[in-house]
Amino acid sequence: MNNTHITLVASTVATKNVGRITQIIGPVLDASFPPGKMPNIYNALIIKGQNPAGQEINITCEVQQLLGDNKVRAVAMSATDGLMRGMEVTDTGAPLSVPVGESTLGRIFNVLGEPIDNLGPVDAATTLPIHRSAPAFTQLDTKLSIFETGIKVVDLLAPYRRGGKIGLFGGAGVGKTVLIMELINNIAKAHGGVSVFGGVGERTREGNDLYMEMKESKVINEENISESKVALVYGQMNEPPGARMRVGLTALTMAEYFRDINKQDVLLFIDNIFRFVQAGSEVSALLGRMPSAVGYQPTLSTEMGSLQERITSTKEGSITSIQAVYVPADDLTDPAPATTFAHLDATTVLSRGLAAKGIYPAVDPLDSTSTMLQPWIVGTEHYDTAQGVKQTLQRYKELQDIIAILGLDELSEEDRLVVARARKVERFLSQPFFVAEVFTGSPGKYVSLAETIKGFQMILAGELDHLPEQAFYLVGNINEATAKAATLS
């Protein structure tokens, strides 16, 4: 397939199907081609030349619409500064293609699959187009198993599925990126397969921090790049919407190759899937589409579906995907997060209220869900403990109004006990992170699932009623809580 693809590109460039720019509106441009030589939808167009200042221009665009009168409308993958009407546009005859395989490991790429880490060219002998169809139903794998993360609140209340799709939902500044970094730290380091990280429309500083951290932890091996276990694909906030709209597909294409050809288990991290939707909405109006609910593009569900349906596990290998989802104005009913919900196996919802209390990770134990939390999957002990924790926290939530008006003293003895245990549970759900050591000064903790279950069982059974609630705050397992209590008294 790859050879035919490469020869196809070579033959089309040889015959050179050339058009001219007729209109430029921001990141969207129109080009006219000779009759009978119209490029196909999703074909890559290349514009080369010089701008008025004499600087070289090399811009790749993707065809989005055929307008009639031999005109096409395309979205640019980089800034359109310096383009003029009448400039030549060359049709490559094929969709955007990016390098895949072992040569991508340890490197940083942009949306076009070009390395941007100043470490020289990448062997692009094997390339794949970024637009591909999802695997057939007959190819899909339906095995159910838990993916342990070492984070108590996640493993106990909303466990992740191996080969599943997980969403981290939260508004601005509640800790989505820190949580995704911790998951990379806990899972990618211990994970035998490869990881692909797609930075979609997020801060460049965070992308740089992640790269430096991966080099320090040897996930990216500087001495021997080929031994690295991760490929990074960035299309950050400063990029035009065309790049942010397609960079997720570039990362996914690299992950699919490891799954389908190398038959590996792959981790795919995307930060942030909302920016993919946002970029689509930015170009949607310029492409002449009528906006739909809240100003989003009318094709929102289709675009999301075409990306998410490709992120799946087949009989060849699995892709476990962890995606951060920004929630505009903390409104989970906004069309962007609401559309994402439908595709996920587990949702980890971050709460501003918990972040304000200083409970990190600020995961809302009552809002977060997982299809894996079934007694026949996780076992009755895990299931019963999780349900007990949720019931205790739910009762505490119901009692909060009474406490606010009348005070704790007006509660029955039984309710006071529930409140005391719920506050301990709430604090024990917090945990020091490895990636946050620099902020907190506390060393990070990885807590196994067995230790997590044991700790919460002891709190719910009342075995630790004599300990102060501060002892449970920002500790790992239950033994650390009892040790901390001894230092407090």
Curated annotation (Swiss-Prot):
Coiled coil (residue ranges): none
Protein's membrane topology: Peripheral membrane protein
InterPro entries named in the record: AAA+_ATPase, ATP-synt_VA_C, ATP_synth_F1_bsu, ATPase_a/bsu_AS, ATPase_alpha/beta_chains, ATPase_F1/V1/A1_a/bsu_N, ATPase_F1/V1/A1_a/bsu_N_sf, ATPase_F1/V1/A1_a/bsu_nucl-bd
Subunit and interaction comment: F-type ATPases have 2 components, CF(1) - the catalytic core - and CF(0) - the membrane proton channel. CF(1) has five subunits: alpha(3), beta(3), gamma(1), delta(1), epsilon(1). CF(0) has four main subunits: a(1), b(1), b'(1) and c(9-12).
Major location category of this protein: plastid
Taxonomic lineage of the native organism: Eukaryota, Viridiplantae, Streptophyta, Zygnematophyceae, Zygnematophycidae
UniProt-recorded name of the protein: ATP synthase subunit beta, chloroplastic
Gene3D superfamilies listed in its UniProt record: 2.40.10.170, Bovine Mitochondrial F1-atpase, Atp Synthase Beta Chain, Chain D, domain 3, P-loop containing nucleotide triphosphate hydrolases
Organism for this UniProt entry: Zygnema circumcarinatum (Green alga)
Entry function: Produces ATP from ADP in the presence of a proton gradient across the membrane. The catalytic sites are hosted primarily by the beta subunits.
